[in-house]
Amino acid sequence: MIVKTDMKKVTLLIPVYNEEAMLPTLYQRLIELVNRNAVYEWEILFVNDGSSDTTLECLRRLRQQDKRVNYVNLSRNFGKEVAMLAGFDYATGDCCVVMDADLQDPPELVDQMLEYWEEGYDDIYAKRRTRGEESWLRRQFSLAFYGILQRMSRIDILPNVGDFRLLDRRCVLTLRRLRECERYTKGLFCWIGYQKKSIEFDRGDRLMGHSSWNFLKLLNLAVEGITSFSIAPLRIATVCGVLCSISSFIYAIYFLIKTVLYGDETAGFPTLIIVMLFLGGIQLFSLGIIGEYVGRIFKETKGRPTYIASDYNEEKLGYDR
């Protein structure tokens, strides 16, 4: 006999990549959270993003001992942004809490998120007061990036806000529909709207292991964020081209008048080289910006699935959902 329950279901969504050392500690912290909130039905959903260590075996063991644990195993490493989309596709809860596996985002904050969710908020996000072990340079880079993105984008991209948040089911269903290949999920959270609420917290240090997010990956994410939510770089290139043309015209008029009225000889070769190098640099810069956008269009028009799931729990898949 099937017993119908009126309990709301909460999905904890955790993308993981080479997190074998963190999983036991993470699982214990999550179980403490679950036990404190027994009024809800819980799903602990891990998305294994092509880990090369024993992360998948650890997830299988957790699944064997606790059927509330589900896992999606991607066929290769697609990146955290895509792993989150896979999690949204497989999440079954009335709300979904997105969090990192490194415990820098404390699970204890979920209790307060659930309270705001019950009050009617759709997107309860955690805003960092402090940023833990981050270096001064990385912190300044982050501030500069968000400052640039705020000025270029037409939507309000929130600074010091990561992926750690609770999303109502309708937010999850909306995010499922956004299937672009090159993803900047922090921007998508802001783009979809809905009623939002912030919770401030002090982000701790990573307990063990090291982050896979190096400077180049962060720089690539910054480029994705800017090109996903703004065409301002294209306009900047256009403005630079116009300014260079006007400057060149004024420069030519100046030397023409100087030669005709005063008979001064123009030092042609050095001037020509300087102008050519300057204009060549502007052209290459503009082509690079155009190339970024054309590359994004090329990837989207191929129509490939955003990810391929290899396993869902004990079920072999080998296709995209």
What name fits each language-model region?
Residues 17-21, 104, 108, 176, ...:
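Residues in soluble alpha-helical coiled-coils and helical-bundle/repeat scaffolds
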Residues 2-133:
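Structured catalytic core of nucleotide-sugar glycosyltransferases
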Residues 2-7, 184-321:
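Hydrophobic helical membrane-anchoring modules
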Residues 61, 72-76, 80-90, 106-188, ...:
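Acceptor/aglycone-binding surface of glycosyltransferases and processive sugar-polymer synthases
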Residues 15, 74-76, 165, 238, ...:
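Short conserved micro-motifs on helix faces and helix-strand junctions that flank
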